[in-house]
Structure formats: C-alpha cells, structure tokens
Regions:
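Conserved NAD(P)H cofactor-binding loop of Rossmann-fold oxidoreductase domains
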Residues: 90-95
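SDR active-site lid
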Residues: 172-235, 245, 249, 253
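Residue(s) in the substrate-gating loop at a strand-loop-helix junction
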Residues: 142
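Conserved glycine-rich Rossmann-like NAD(P)H-binding loop of the short-chain dehydrogenase/reductase
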Residues: 28-44
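Substrate-binding pocket helix/loop in short-chain dehydrogenase/reductase
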Residues: 98-100, 106-111
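Active-site helix of classical SDR
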Residues: 122, 158
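Conserved glycine-rich cofactor-binding loop
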Residues: 12-16
Length: 269
C-alpha cells in the first residue's frame, strides 16, 4: 500500500493526459485525489488504479467551469485531512472557429476552466507547500502557449497566460523548496478535439497525434526532476523554437493554414 500521507491531486484525472499521469503517480506509490466532471468516469478510473497499483483513490466530481468549484474541492480535501504533496492542473478545454462566430459564453467558461481553476488551485496549494517547504506542481499548458492560434484564439491565449503566470510565480518561490513545472504538449490523441468541435481541422483530421501516455511520461519525469518546462515531442520542440524567432504574423499565418477546416468553413459549429 502507498504511504498514507503521500497524495497527488490531479484535475482532469479521469481521461487523456491526466489519467496517464495518475497511472504514473500510482506506480510511484502516490495515493490520488482525482477531479473531473463525470462521476462514472472517475469511478471507473479509480477502480482500475486501486486494483492495479494498490493505492487509495479519492474522487471528486466537480464542475470547474464554476468559479467556486476549486474552493469546494480544496475544502473537501482539507476536511478529509489529506495533505497534497503534488498538484497537477490538467483540466482544460478549447473551442474551434473564427472568434467572431464562436460562443462568448462558452469562451468565458473556457477562460474560467483554463485560467481561473489553475490560478485558484495553484494559490491554495502553493501557500501550503511554501509553508512546509516541500511540494511539486505540474501545470499542463500547451505548445499553443508559444504560438498564436487562429481558429483557437481564446484557447491559445489561455495557455499563454498559464505559461507566463507559472514562470513568474516560479521565480517568486524559487528558494522555497517547492518546484513548479510546465508541460507543453502538442496535438495529442485525447477527447479534447471532440469537445472543441475541432475534428475537421486539418492538423487533427490529417496530422499525427501524440500518445497521451508518452506526453504524461515527459511531464512526470520533468516534474520529478524539478525541471522548469518541457515541450513534449521533438517536432513540437522545433515548432516552439521557431515560434520564438520568426515574426509573429508569419507564425500566425502558418498556424492558420495548419488549423484550416477540411470542409473550408471556418465558422464555429
């Protein structure tokens, strides 16, 4: 059995990269607190992890589109007397289409999930970690943080925020004993694109997708090594590097071409 005091909290922990990260923590004998919207998916994931790795898995079904969601998760974990040694902010969504045709209410929800929840969880748990001089935080950002994303303008913007925000906070706590790591995946084979109505984008429909297990491994190893940031995948590293040296308008044009819909209709659907 895992050490009763060694817990990792993972948002978006029932699927995709978050689920693969949960497996890696469990292999290293971390107990888990998994947060997602679907109780059914959480229960299935928890049962599999408990059976395979013999760890304790607590699940919290919570809608992190709601600003109070992270606070409620924090209070519930605290009420159970659980100390979080590792925080993984992974839950996130996007929306595909030209900004003039996308749904503003959906975008405001995405901003709350991709930024609000990250900032809240980071604030609440970083304060505890700094006070005890130990802890690790993994922020799942995106390659999109490094480059503008036509047809995903809000999503890329939220990820640029997360990377910039994390780099600033990391500097503030650099001598505290707490490490904060950024994981920037590229296109990964998860349900993200279905939720974003993005399956018709050329980069998704015709391009290759990374295995979420490989992405999770890159992030987990970087987290445990105390690294600042990892871009997962060689070609993504190349694209991130080019994004930092080429003119912004050229990068935006290249990304626009990659994200074009196969049906030619860029409007949100």
């Amino acid at each position: 059995m895992a050490d009763q005091q060694k817990y990792a909290l993972i948002t978006g922990g029932s699927s995709g990269i978050g689920r693969e990260l949960a497996k890696l923590f469990a292999q290293d004998h971390y107990n888990l607190v998994l947060v997602a919207r679907s109780q059914d998916e959480l229960a299935q994931t928890a049962a599999e992890l408990q059976q395979q790795y013999g760890v304790q898995v607590h699940t919290i079904a919570k809608d992190l589109f709601e600003p109070q969601g992270p606070f409620e998760v924090y209070d519930e974990i605290k009420a159970q007397g659980i100390q979080i040694e590792a925080l993984v902010n992974d839950a996130g969504q996007g929306q595909y289409g030209t900004f003039t045709t996308t749904d503003i209410n959906r975008e405001l929800d995405i901003i709350q999930l991709n930024i609000g929840a990250y900032v809240t969880f980071t604030k609440l748990y970083l304060q505890e970690m700094v006070a005890r001089k130990s802890g690790k935080i993994l922020q799942v950002s995106s390659l999109g943080a490094e480059i503008p994303g036509p047809l995903q303008a809000v999503y890329h913007g939220t990820k640029a925020f997360i990377t910039s925000f994390t780099e600033a906070v990391r500097e503030e706590v650099k001598d505290s004993g707490v490490t904060i790591t950024i994981l920037e995946p590229g296109v990964t084979d998860t349900d993200f694109f279905n939720k974003a109505s993005m399956e018709r984008a050329k980069i998704v429909a015709e391009g290759s997708k990374a295995d979420p297990a490989d992405v999770a491994k890159d992030g987990y190893e970087a987290l445990m090594a105390g690294k600042d940031k990892v871009v997962s995948g060689f070609m993504n590293k190349v694209q991130a590097a080019l994004g930092n040296v080429l003119p912004d308008n050229l990068v935006a044009a290249q990304m626009h071409k990659q994200a074009e819909p196969v049906d030619g209709d860029e409007r949100s659907k």
